[in-house]
Amino acid sequence: MSTTAASRVERAVAASSPADVEPVTLTASALESTAPSYLRDLKSELAAEGYQPATLRAEARFGEDCSIETQREADRLRDIVRAASFLGAGRVTVDVTAVADESRVEPALSALEERAQREGVSLSVEGPVAV
């Protein structure tokens, strides 16, 4: 983290007060949809119960050596990153369980990381491939 980013964080936190909310990790597979209307309602319901999504966790499989299937899975993960941003979660954790061809998967995950940064979300990838 750069000095500038650290000082921004320190200033923001110093001017803050504790909130009575419980941070939670949501599992992407438990979401009924990534549609904005569903996410808006879920966010409201979570807040009413005193929960704040901190992390959205997703499982990913890149088990087929096929560009179309790799792109389809990358698109699904992009929807999850957008959902995390919409919900106010600061992190998306992707558990990669299968990789058929790293040369196809690594660029897709790099693009996903760039998207996450643009959405204001931190991305971490766990499993046999890294970003």
Identify the residue ranges that each predicted region occupies.
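Active-site acidic/histidine proton-transfer and metal-coordination neighborhood
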Residues: 65-131
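N-terminal pre-domain/capping segments
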Residues: 1-71, 75
